């Protein structure tokens, strides 16, 4: 194989490489074997046409496209490796020449990783808003949330106030015509929760069980059902029950109900304080790490970031997100319907984040390279075992899912992040 690279512009160029007969002939054989089983030629049984007869009747050239598809991926990867290029995005392949009995010549327009000129990434000074301090108010708020979770709903005869739950039937109409999705029975609605469109819940404050009220509202202009957006609607609403929350007293009995490992409210407060301190410690460290990495990226210069890298990151993130949704039983169509968004909206959301992620990865990779970080066999094994434990998977399954190169890259990246953070100072 002969290879060459011609630089066309910053981070862009053309690879030209040849594919030798030692690779072409087996690929042609494979292409022929793939199609011969379907060949019907008079005088020969189906699938038993000899190769010389095939070449005579159809010409060997009809196999070239399939043969190229067979041999091209490995040949392209070999050319990239021989030229030691850091290629990103999919190449644009062109056939320069494909002549019988001669090596094939192929060209590939490629985009390469941009040069990263590192700035300061050690001994950085950063400011973060996160704090390690845990206040009494935060401890009390955590207990209050648990207390509210233990609250019971009790039917009352008095009029509903904000925070009460009403059990209602409702029928919605626009210009006197009922619409799909505008009807409900025995629906429990907490007043002030914001579950319904603006204005609906406010008008039920003051109602009592047995009352029927016409609730007049206007759908928001950006309402997900376009045929209702901006329109005035009337909901005939019948209140069946009004329920108020009864929360337990703030005492030692509450503490034991919340956590069976404690005996008193003071013990619960002490336990929650430790938990909050541990969580805040992690959040503080994460904030410092994030700020330090952001500063290291800002201090670096990336020479003309290729837009293809950003586009690829957008699609990677979108595919990952949609994959997670589908694993939860939510199809893309269902997600967009539930959120009132479109695929274009999601693309724009990820596009605004992708540029930052790509730049961050490039700078961390450059730091790893500058520091000469490599992963040892022991570190790779530890990473595999850690991942197996984290995801509750057999070690061998993790080993087959992740390539050694991927693990080496991830370990080197982690070491680079440690270099940034181990000397950082918080102002």
Curated annotation (Swiss-Prot):
GO terms for cellular component: cytoplasm. It comes from Streptococcus uberis (strain ATCC BAA-854 / 0140J). Keywords: Cell cycle, Cell division, Chaperone, Cytoplasm, Isomerase, Rotamase. Belongs to the FKBP-type PPIase family. Tig subfamily. GO terms for molecular function: peptidyl-prolyl cis-trans isomerase activity; protein folding chaperone; ribosome binding. It holds the Pfam family Trigger_C. This is Trigger factor. NCBIfam families: tig. It is found in: Cytoplasm. PANTHER family: TRIGGER FACTOR CHAPERONE AND PEPTIDYL-PROLYL CIS/TRANS ISOMERASE, TRIGGER FACTOR-LIKE PROTEIN TIG, CHLOROPLASTIC. It is an enzyme of class 5 (isomerase). It comes from the Bacteria.
């Amino acid at each position: 194989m002969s290879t060459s690279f011609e630089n066309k512009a910053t981070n862009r160029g053309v690879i030209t490489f040849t594919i030798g007969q030692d690779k072409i002939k087996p690929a042609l054989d494979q292409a022929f074997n793939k199609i011969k089983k379907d060949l019907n030629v008079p005088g020969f049984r189906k699938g038993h046409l000899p190769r010389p007869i095939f070449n005579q009747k159809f010409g060997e050239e009809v196999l070239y496209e399939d043969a190229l598809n067979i041999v091209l991926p490995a040949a392209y990867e070999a050319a990239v490796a021989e030229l030691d290029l850091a290629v990103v995005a999919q190449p644009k392949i062109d056939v320069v020449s494909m002549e019988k009995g001669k090596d094939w010549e192929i060209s590939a327009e490629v985009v390469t990783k941009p040069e990263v000129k590192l700035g300061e990434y050690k001994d950085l000074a950063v400011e973060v808003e996160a704090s390690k301090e845990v206040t009494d108010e935060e401890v009390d708020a955590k207990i209050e949330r648990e207390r509210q979770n233990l609250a019971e709903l009790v039917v009352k005869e008095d009029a509903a106030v904000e925070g009460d739950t009403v059990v209602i039937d409702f029928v919605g109409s626009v210009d006197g015509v009922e619409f799909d999705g505008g009807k409900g029975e025995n629906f429990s609605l907490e007043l002030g929760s914001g579950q319904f469109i603006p204005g609906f819940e406010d008008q039920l404050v003051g109602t009592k069980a047995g009352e029927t009220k016409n609730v007049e509202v206007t759908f928001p202009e950006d309402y997900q059902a376009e045929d209702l957006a901006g329109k005035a609607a009337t909901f005939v609403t019948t209140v069946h029950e009004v329920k108020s929350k009864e929360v337990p007293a703030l005492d030692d009995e509450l503490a034991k109900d919340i956590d069976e490992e404690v005996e008193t409210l003071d013990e619960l407060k002490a336990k929650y304080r430790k938990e909050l301190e541990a969580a805040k410690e992690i959040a503080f460290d994460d904030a410092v790490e994030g700020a330090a990495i952001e500063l290291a990226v800002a201090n670096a210069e990336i020479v003309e970031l290729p837009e293809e890298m950003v586009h690829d990151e957008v699609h990677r993130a979108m595919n990952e997100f949609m994959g997670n949704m589908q694993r939860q039983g939510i199809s893309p169509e269902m997600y967009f319907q539930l959120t009132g968004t479109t695929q274009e909206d999601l693309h724009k959301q990820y596009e605004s984040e992708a540029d930052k992620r790509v730049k961050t990865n490039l700078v961390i990779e450059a730091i790893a390279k500058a520091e000469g970080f490599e992963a040892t066999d022991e570190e790779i094994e530890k990473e595999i075992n850690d991942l197996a434990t984290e995801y509750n998977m057999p070690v061998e399954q993790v080993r087959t899912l992740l390539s050694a190169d991927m693990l080496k890259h991830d370990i080197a990246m982690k070491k680079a992040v440690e270099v940034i953070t181990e000397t950082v100072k918080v102002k």
